Amino acid sequence: MAGLTAAAPRPGVLLLLLSILHPSRPGGVPGAIPGGVPGGVFYPGAGLGALGGGALGPGGKPLKPVPGGLAGAGLGAGLGAFPAVTFPGALVPGGVADAAAAYKAAKAGAGLGGVPGVGGLGVSAGAVVPQPGAGVKPGKVPGVGLPGVYPGGVLPGARFPGVGVLPGVPTGAGVKPKAPGVGGAFAGIPGVGPFGGPQPGVPLGYPIKAPKLPGGYGLPYTTGKLPYGYGPGGVAGAAGKAGYPTGTGVGPQAAAAAAAKAAAKFGAGAAGVLPGVGGAGVPGVPGAIPGIGGIAGVGTPAAAAAAAAAAKAAKYGAAAGLVPGGPGFGPGVVGVPGAGVPGVGVPGAGIPVVPGAGIPGAAVPGVVSPEAAAKAAAKAAKYGARPGVGVGGIPTYGVGAGGFPGFGVGVGGIPGVAGVPGVGGVPGVGGVPGVGISPEAQAAAAAKAAKYGAAGAGVLGGLVPGAPGAVPGVPGTGGVPGVGTPAAAAAKAAAKAAQFGLVPGVGVAPGVGVAPGVGVAPGVGLAPGVGVAPGVGVAPGVGVAPGIGPGGVAAAAKSAAKVAAKAQLRAAAGLGAGIPGLGVGVGVPGLGVGAGVPGLGVGAGVPGFGAGADEGVRRSLSPELREGDPSSSQHLPSTPSSPRVPGALAAAKAAKYGAAVPGVLGGLGALGGVGIPGGVVGAGPAAAAAAAKAAAKAAQFGLVGAAGLGGLGVGGLGVPGVGGLGGIPPAAAAKAAKYGAAGLGGVLGGAGQFPLGGVAARPGFGLSPIFPGGACLGKACGRKRK
C-alpha cells in the first residue's frame, strides 16, 4: 500500500505497478450486481467505476465524455456477470435470484465491460453505445446483426445521417433528421463528421464495418446520401429520397393503405347521393336523408341502376316527356306504371315491392327488368331517342304494348310515369313522343333523294318520240318519263333524234307509208321517186353530174349546204312545207317523182320549199341566192308578194332542239299535195325512235339515188311525188352534204318558167357544181359561193 501511495503522484509508475500486480482474494470476488464493492485490493479494471463514484454518475450511469475526460473509461459495470455461487466469498449469497438478476442485467445491456481506460486521459477508443448482451438473439430488423439498407432498430424513425436509428431515440413526425457537421447530438462524436462516418446499417461502435453499396441497393427509399458520404454536408443526394422505407408499416403510404382498406371495409362514410333510405324506408321513395354513409340506398339494385341511368340521361338530354325524376302526374293507363298495377301504390305510395313495377308480372313495363330498362334508357338518351309512341320494353315498329320507344302507337313509357326510382321509372306516356320518323332520318332521306333525284310527279309527260307530251325528257308521273318507252331509252332516242333531226310524219315512220313517202322506200318505186329514180332525165352521177358515183364533190357539197342553211333561215315556206320533206311531193333532194331540181315535189323549185312559195319569197333572198336561182327575175316577172308563211324557220328550230313542233300550216298546198306537215308524232314510240335512228344514219352517210331520166318531167310539173324522204331536216341534209350526198337532180329544171316554185337551199348537184340541177346562168357561173 505504501508502494501504491508513493507511486500515485507518478502515473507511469502507477500504471507499471498495476500491470504487474496480481489480485489477492482475501475476501472473495467482486459481486454480481454493478456497484458492488470487491473484496481485497483494487482489481484491475475496477477503478473508480465499481464504487459508484468517480467515472459513475448518479444512478450508476456513465458520465458524458468531455474534452480531457474523467478518470475511468469503462462502462463501470464491473465484472459482475457471474453468479455469486461460482466463487465463494461473494458478498451477496448466490442462488437462483442472482442468476436471474445476472441474466436480466445482461439482457438490459449491462454485459461485459469494455477495455479499461487510463484515468485522466479522456475518452478512449472503447465502445460508447451499449450493445446487446449475451442473452439477446440477433435482431430481425435489417441493420442488427447483418448490415441492411436502413439502420437497425425497432422501427425506422428520425434519422441521423451516418448513424441510423438509435435505441431510445424518440421517433415520430416531430423529430427532424440531423446532418453531420452542422451541430446536433452527434456533432462531436469521432467518425461522424462531414466526411460521412459510419455507413447506414452499422450502429456506432459496431466491431464489423460492412461496405455500403452505392445507391442503397436500388431501393426507392434510402437515407438520401450519395455513396460513401459524397455530397455537400450530408445533404440528400441522388442515391434515393429520404423517407420511411416501404414495407415497414409506417409512414404516409402505410397510412393511406390502411385508410383505403378501412374505407373499403366500412364504406366511405360520405352522405349518399342516391335516394332510397329516407322516409318510412319504402324502397324507391325519395327520403329526407339520401343514403346512409355512402351506401346507396337500401332498396334493390334497380334503384342504383335507375339512378345512374337517370343521371346519364340528364347529362346527354333526357327523352322527351315528363321531367325525369319528378312525381308522376302524367297520363297513364291501367296496367301501365303510374296509374294501375303498377302505378298508384307502387313504390312510394303503397306496397313496397320492386320500385316502379308494382306487383311483379301483373303490369307492363314489358318483360324488361328495371336494370335493363334503365340501361336502355341511358343509351337511348346518349345517342338520341327515336320518336314514336310505345308502351315500354325493347323498340318495336308496330302497335302494341311493351317495348322501348317504338315507332308504333302505344301507351306506356320506360318503365312508368314518375321519376327514377320513384313511382314509375323514367317518365313518359308514349316513350319518346312522336309518331313519324325522326328529323335525322327525314333529313337523311331527303339528302339521299336530292342526291339521286327524288321520284315525284312529272311536270309534263314529255315528248319522247312516240309518247305524248310537250317537253321532251321531263319525267312523267312517278318519275317514269313518257308512257310506254323507258325513260333512259326514250331520252337517248330523243337526244339522238334532236341531233340528227326528227322524222316527222304520220305513218309507222315519218311520212305516210311504211317509210317516208307511201311506197316501200322514198317514193313508190325502187328508189326515190316513182319511176326508176328521181327526176326523169339523166340523173346526176350517171353520166354528167356527180352524186351517184363517187358521192359528189365534197367541197362543193359543203358550200351548197351552207348556202342552203342561210336561205332556209331567211325564207318563208309556202303551204305544205314545214320541216323540209314533209309535204306530199316535197322532200330532201331527189325524192319526188317529178323532174326539176332534185327533191322537189309537184312542180319545180329550189329544194326545200313547197309549191306555195311565191315571188315575194324569192325576192326576200340574198342577191347571191337570186343570182343562181333559175326562177329569179330572169325567168319570172315581178309579181305581187303573197303572205309569207313561216315553215322552214320553224323547221330549223325544231331540228335544233329535236322537239316535234306541230305544223304551222297543215292542209293543202297550192301544188304541193296533201302532206301532214310538221311535228305530228308517229304512231309508236319504238318505231319513231327506230325511224329517227335510221334517218340519222342515212343522213350521216348520204343517200344513194338511182339513175333516172333528167329533163322536163311532165310539162315542167312532173307527176306529183308521193312522199319524199320525209323527216330529214336541214341538219340532216347538212350532214349528208358533209359526207357527200348523192345528187339526184336532172339536167335542167322544168320547161319554161318554174310554176310557182319555191326558192330554198340547193343540196345535190346537177350540171354545175355551183347551182345543182341547173345550167350555168349569169355571173355566178363557175364561181364558188360560201
UniProtKB/Swiss-Prot annotation:
Record field: compositional bias (Low complexity): 630-645
Q: Does the keyword Disulfide bond apply?
A: yes
Q: Which UniProt keywords apply?
A: Disulfide bond, Extracellular matrix, Hydroxylation, Repeat, Secreted, Signal, Williams-Beuren syndrome
Signal peptide start and end residues = 1-26
List every position bearing 4-hydroxyproline. 116, 190, 283, 286, 327, 342, 347, 360, 415, 427, 481, 580, 589, 598, 607, 677
Q: What PTMs does it carry?
A: Elastin is formed through the cross-linking of its soluble precursor tropoelastin. Cross-linking is initiated through the action of lysyl oxidase on exposed lysines to form allysine. Subsequent spontaneous condensation reactions with other allysine or unmodified lysine residues result in various bi-, tri-, and tetrafunctional cross-links. The most abundant cross-links in mature elastin fibers are lysinonorleucine, allysine aldol, desmosine, and isodesmosine.
Cystine links in this protein are C776-C781
Q: Give Gene Ontology CC terms.
A: collagen-containing extracellular matrix; elastic fiber; extracellular matrix; extracellular region
Q: Where in the cell is it found?
A: Secreted, Extracellular space, Extracellular matrix
* Region annotation (Disordered) ranges: 615-645
What's the domain of life for this entry?
Answer: Eukaryota
Q: Which disease is it linked to?
A: Cutis laxa, autosomal dominant, 1: A connective tissue disorder characterized by loose, hyperextensible skin with decreased resilience and elasticity leading to a premature aged appearance. Face, hands, feet, joints, and torso may be differentially affected. Additional variable clinical features are gastrointestinal diverticula, hernia, and genital prolapse. Rare manifestations are pulmonary artery stenosis, aortic aneurysm, bronchiectasis, and emphysema.
Q: Would you identify the family this protein belongs to, as annotated?
A: Belongs to the elastin family.
Oligomer and partners = The polymeric elastin chains are cross-linked together into an extensible 3D network. Forms a ternary complex with BGN and MFAP2. Interacts with MFAP2 via divalent cations (calcium > magnesium > manganese) in a dose-dependent and saturating manner. Interacts with FBLN5. Interacts with FBN1. Forms a ternary complex with FBN1 and FBLN2 or FBLN5. Interacts with MFAP4 in a Ca (2+)-dependent manner; this interaction promotes ELN self-assembly. Interacts with EFEMP2 with moderate affinity.
| PANTHER family (alphabetical) | ELASTIN
Protein known as: Elastin
Taxonomy of origin reads: Eukaryota, Metazoa, Chordata, Craniata, Vertebrata
Encoding gene per record: ELN
